[in-house]
Amino acid sequence: MQKLAEAIAAAVQAGQDKDWGKMGTSIVGIVENGISVLGKIFGF
């Protein structure tokens, strides 16, 4: 869950800095970590 929060924070910071490349990779990290969290919850 901590990695998900870190990915969200990185995406927000990248948006504020207008670093679109980093923002894109941060969004991928959010999706990746979100799927991992859901997998743990539902036992995938």
Swiss-Prot record:
It holds the Pfam family PSMbeta. Keywords: Antibiotic, Antimicrobial, Cytolysis, Hemolysis, Secreted, Toxin, Virulence. One of its GO terms (molecular function) is toxin activity. GO terms for biological process: defense response to bacterium; killing of cells of another organism. One of its GO terms (cellular component) is extracellular region. It comes from the Bacteria. It is found in: Secreted. The keyword Secreted applies. Belongs to the staphylococcal hemolytic protein family. Has hemolytic activity and also inhibits the growth of gonococci. This is Antibacterial protein 1 homolog. The lineage of its organism: Bacteria, Bacillati, Bacillota, Bacilli, Bacillales.
